[in-house]
Amino acid sequence: MVKKVFSFVWLITMAGTAAAEEAPDTIGRELDEVVVSGTAARQRLGDVRPGTERLELSTLKQLPSFGGENDIIRSLTLLPGVRSEGDGGGGFEVRGGSASQNLVLVDGITLYNPAHVMGIFSTFNDDALSSATLFKGAVPAMYGGASSSVLATQLAPGDMESYHGSFTVGLLAAKLKAEGPVVKDKLSFAVAARRSYVDAFLKMIPQYRSTVMNFYDVTARLRFIPSERNIVDGTFFISHDNMAVGNLMGMYWGNIGGSLNWLARSSDSFSVTSTLALTHFEPKMEMDIMDDDQVMRTYIHNYSLNERFRLALTDDHGLELGLRSELLRVRSAEWAQGASFEREIRSLWQNALWADYAGRFGEHFDVDLGVRLSVATVPTGRHFHDFHSNEGLQADFSGKTYFDVEPRAALKYALTSLHSIKAGVGMSTQNLHAIRSGMTSFPFDRYALTSASVKPEKSLQYSLGYAGMTYDGGFDWSAEVYYRDIDNVYDFKDGRSTFSDIMLENIILGGRGRSYGLELMARKNIGRLTGWISYTLSHTQTKIAGINDGRWYDATNDRRHDVTVTAIYRLSDSWSFSGSWIYLSGQPLTAPDVKYEIAGETCYYYSRRNAYLTPSTHRLDLSATYTHTGARFTYQWSFGLYNAYCRYNPTVVYFEDDPSKPSGTRAVQQSMYGLIPSVSYTLKF
């Protein structure tokens, strides 16, 4: 089943290519592009938390775009310790973690599988964003539920004084943005929408006229300022993908969410932020094979309430306290085939209290100390667990409560005004598990909630780093080492995959994981030519009793070497050029050791998990941008080459018979993208 799905994705994609917290008083900011040049060198040096990346706004096109889209996720992968899942995967992986171990937030709304059309675009419309911060090391105590990293993004509020807008038309998609006041200085709006039209090109090719591949997303934000000490924000987000080949197969998924945020200041030193948020993520797959209809559905429903209290004790010391209550309801699997119907739905209630203290002691020493107390309750009864199977299977729905204490700490010592040392330690707990059987994450991965038998995933990470810069900030550099130990990592049993059994506990096993590495980065910040070079050396392993004879084995997402080189050249006020080169060493792969025949069918025997490597991945992206700024209008032309030297990187590797080989078997690589040119036109008014 999984092989058919990957084959379908590869088919339609090849067809297509052939043809940190927003400042409360920030009002009316306009985003022209999100870039990962990082913060100013001085601010990077002064950040207390190691492994923190703040993505800045810029009015200049700087990084190569894909199809005319400046993508946050793709930009993140140019940083050390962060990498893409590869072609066909829309997620990002941080310090050996999988994409499902990241917490991705938009104005407090949790997003799942934040990707369009199998990773061609992310669900982030850059026109709508105001700011973004990635925590890959010491995560603040206010964030929980993710064992790897946190990406916190905020949408830009509408201008309270005047109306603005823009639209962009590219080869693959178009987008529109509008913002302005509803009631001047009191109520504003900002709306951004995007829609792809890959289908139009597919219909020009006779053999792909019945193929559907499109997506859309809409973001909207209202800001209301009833008084000088109160701000109320309402956010709405929806994204949806459609992929199908006639009546043979269809895949659909998307997020829909909303949040209401109220910031109240009782004084200049004390404020309270209340946030109510919800998310619905619902993938669906349909297949019609020889008149045999098959339907597979899953969903994740997330409802949360957050309270955050901030108190400035002095100019150099501050305290934050908060609480969070969250209800998760997950349909791990539901599929129907003919008269057969099976379904599994589970629920989990999470509550947390947290505290965070930040202080400065003299000119050299800064500290951030936090703790998070989390309680995960697995409720009992049919109201919280819905299980149905034609096979008459029974499940143990006994309840259980887990208590966890998650300490967090970050320290910075300034050796001089130009050099600093940072250290961090943090524990995180995750109760939503995604178990994948492919090389990348997938909208139809099996999701499991912590239960009486599936334990919470617990991560403990240590990090130590050094940062330095030149006196004028023209150059800065950093080095960081980390070690992460994880308990209760889950993987499929040998011979099992996503759709092997409706009862997830029957097909998975739990164990330990570990990841450690070195991250290096050097940047040039001044002059016509700017850019950065990053290198990551890392190793990620898993050890599970019952898999690989209980020995450590390389995790599916282990990539030993990761190199990125990014250059930006500003020829004039109108023209700028950029390029980025990315290299990733091979990905672990499970290959057969022996094959045999049963009733004329070839069967393979796998003795070791992930003992082989796929070929390495590398590509070069190039772009050129022309910008004209007028009195009332600004327009921009962007030209790009994705994968400029047309390297076919592996997306799926499988094995088949080949009598010409001494082993009688050969590995077959399928790739998604070759050289993809792009052009887009943007008008701002």
Enumerate the language-model features and the residues they cover:
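Periplasmic N-terminal accessory/gating domains of Gram-negative outer-membrane beta-barrel systems
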Residues: 47-100, 106-139, 156
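Gram-negative outer-membrane beta-barrel transporters
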Residues: 483-485, 506-593
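A beta-strand signature from Gram-negative outer-membrane beta-barrel systems
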Residues: 78-79, 123-166, 175-177, 186
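C-terminal beta-signal and adjacent terminal beta-strands/loops
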Residues: 574, 583-600, 615-619, 625-685
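Surface-exposed extracellular loop regions of Gram-negative outer-membrane beta-barrel proteins
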Residues: 282, 329-334, 377-389, 413, ...
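Signature of Gram-negative outer-membrane beta-barrel scaffolds
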Residues: 325-420, 431-432, 547-550
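Short, acidic, small-residue-rich periplasmic hinge/interaction motif at the N-terminus
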Residues: 20-62, 99, 479
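Outer membrane beta-barrel strand-and-loop segments of large Gram-negative receptors
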Residues: 302-306, 350-354, 449-455, 461, ...
